[in-house]
């Protein structure tokens, strides 16, 4: 079982990190929304506070379970791949962070009154602990240099993301369940101002972290980390466009007779923002699986190599022959066991790899990606119908 876990460990940690970031964003963002946007009792009604509290509480519980699984998976991999006992692993930073995050998530889920009562600023305590737990397992906490600056920027980044993207589900619930246009205008206006401030924080923190983590222009296109940061920036710009449209709609609300049409437009834009926001968060989770570009000073991809790779050519639609593919790691371990040999459970730098990718392996990867691209293209075309 543990051997199979090693094979999917990288993918599994990215998935768990994505769940943690998404759940944290909605839980903390919901708390911020209740305390900063809707603290006035005249803006609160059971029609939207009840479902909003459910979103916050279940996000917090999801966060708790994700932290528990994250600790279990990492602990099993560590004890099976290197000579560490479970007792020694229990003192690792990721265990402390996971325990802290799980406790904070459970505290918010079991909060007295289910968050439906008056604004309670003590809920900021578990919200802050959630952010702290995630920061402890980020790139910032593992850096040897400039750790204080990077931890501060990462914290601001998470807080701003939660305040903006995490508050959108609550705003959506207000717009769908409240009929009083005056209340809608006040809530939307307050959230718009908070979103603008959050965007400034995100932009500032993002620029600082990019300088420290990417380091140079050739790392932007020459490393996987730089390319993924660029992807995040593109999605961020898409969110800015949608947010700008929302800003002008909010300003118009209450000044013309078709406010109900404005409300519908706000709902549609908010739904689109949530979807793109989730994509940005998933991209951020993928970044944690990559070393920062500034650390990869060797073997960076050049512009010439990129141009050659992107030169138009017919895609591969046929699978390579099975004989040209490398044997599976599971099959290699089975044969090694029958031969009385023991293969390393994990790759050790400087050691030998189980196998090196052959031209057949590369062709197989291209074949899979080609058909995956066809599927995505068809889905996009169908969405336009």
Regions found by a protein language model. Name each.
Residues 1-351, 360-363:
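Polytopic transmembrane helical bundles with strong interfacial aromatic enrichment
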Residues 21, 357-380:
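The feature marks the first
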């Amino acid at each position: 079982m543990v051997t199979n876990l090693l094979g999917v460990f990288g993918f599994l940690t990215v998935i768990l990190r994505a769940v943690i970031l998404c759940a944290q964003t909605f839980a903390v963002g919901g708390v911020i929304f209740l305390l900063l946007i809707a603290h006035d009792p005249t803006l609160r009604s059971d029609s939207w506070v009840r479902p909003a509290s459910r979103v916050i509480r279940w996000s917090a519980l999801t966060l708790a379970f994700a932290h528990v699984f994250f600790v279990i998976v990492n602990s099993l991999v560590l004890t099976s791949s290197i000579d560490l006992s479970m007792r020694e692993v229990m003192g690792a930073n990721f265990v402390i962070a996971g325990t802290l995050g799980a406790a904070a998530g459970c505290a918010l889920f079991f909060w007295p009154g289910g968050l439906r009562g008056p604004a309670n600023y003590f809920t900021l305590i578990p919200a802050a602990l959630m952010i702290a737990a995630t920061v402890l397992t980020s790139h910032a906490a593992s850096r040897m240099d400039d750790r204080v600056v990077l931890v501060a920027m990462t914290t601001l980044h998470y807080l701003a993301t939660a305040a903006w993207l995490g508050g959108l589900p609550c705003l959506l619930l207000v717009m769908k369940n409240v009929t009083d246009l005056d209340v809608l205008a006040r809530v939307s206006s307050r959230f718009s101002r908070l979103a603008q401030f959050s965007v400034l924080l995100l932009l500032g923190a993002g620029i600082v972290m990019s300088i420290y983590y990417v380091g140079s222009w050739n790392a932007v296109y020459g490393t996987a980390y730089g390319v993924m940061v660029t992807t995040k920036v593109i999605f961020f710009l898409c969110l800015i466009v949608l947010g700008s449209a929302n800003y002008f709609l909010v300003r118009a609300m209450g000044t013309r007779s078709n406010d109900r049409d404005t409300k519908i437009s706000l709902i549609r834009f908010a739904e689109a923002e949530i979807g793109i926001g989730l994509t940005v968060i998933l991209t951020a989770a993928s970044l944690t699986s990559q070393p920062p570009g500034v650390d990869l000073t060797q073997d960076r991809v050049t512009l010439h190599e990129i141009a050659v790779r992107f030169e138009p050519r017919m895609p591969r639609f046929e699978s390579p022959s099975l004989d040209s593919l490398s044997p599976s790691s599971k099959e290699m371990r089975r044969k090694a066991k029958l031969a009385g040999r023991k293969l390393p459970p994990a790759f050790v730098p400087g050691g030998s790899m189980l196998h090196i990718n052959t031209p057949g392996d590369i062709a197989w990867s291209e074949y899979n990606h080609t058909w995956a691209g066809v599927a995505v293209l068809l889905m996009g075309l169908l969405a336009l119908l």
